Amino acid sequence: MTDQLTIAITTPLEAEHVATIRAVDPRITVLYEPDILPVPRYHADHTGDPSFRRTSEQEQRFLAMLAQADVAFDFDRSHLADLPVIAPKLKWVQATSSGIGQTIMRAGLEDSGIVFTTASGVHARPLADFCLMAMLMFAKDYWLMARDKAAKRWERYSGEELTGKTLAIIGLGRVGKEVASHGKKLDMRVVGLRRSTEPVANVDKIYARAELHEMLAEADVLVLIAPHTPDTEGMIGEAELAVMKPSALLINIARHQLVDEPALIRALQEGRLAGAALDVVSSEPLPPDSPLWDLPNVIISPHSASTVTQENARITAIFCENLRRYLACEPLINVLDTKALY
């Protein structure tokens, strides 16, 4: 390991977190110029204002910063495919997202020699909380309460409870395990699908991929958390939706490519599926003419289920731990497998 390490921060980051990174080791030099980065629109906004464009002078400064970097905290999507050229010293990138596999593949960086580490684990609790919110909103018929409130109508009704319902989870990584934990606290029956059939805490039964339809037929709630890979693309289509209960709820906090969206819309419109909570859709931002906006049994989240005010602090903690490991020539955590894409 060299005596000095230059880090370029390429995403908006609060000053206290920049200071935390600088304090990891005296051998570290941190390059951070907020004025050449997009202005964040909300806490932990890693892409910033989409209308932002660098001036020629700002672009030169940005490229000069990357040219010096041994390590980068996140990546700028406008300079991803050419990253090995403009940042020839770059050895490692710490991403601020968990699901970066497809992005790295599309940029042709899987064989670049650059190590990518992800923010895996940071978003587990917020995403699980989103699933819990969606399940309770449907069980307690939040929309009926909202309609009655708007009409100033007081009329008692009966809801459902989640106890004894079957929660099916596709993808039992950190997020899936957190969702399973929430389900068990509500005394739900929890089942899951994963590549390995090894037991998982809080999961009553593990299904193999060949048993997908069997699992779907049991599900009262289906949560999609698996990464987008060639194996998972389109895994929930017309045939899969057809075997689900008409009373079932589908929650997608993974990637939109896992679901055949037109088939999902038809199932919701025709009453073959009770509802959906979608943090991801095929076109983001969701266009005004999408039928999803008008479906009363759909929750739309603008890809924000994982975003909380504490996010940057948690990502910084992972990065700082990895910096200590990197300087000590120890294995990094959350390393992206550029072949499996997760």
Segments predicted by a language model, with ranges:
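NAD(P)-binding Rossmann-fold cofactor-contacting core
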Residues: D35-P40, K185-N202
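Phosphate/diphosphate ligand-binding glycine-rich loop within oxidoreductases
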Residues: A67-A146, E160
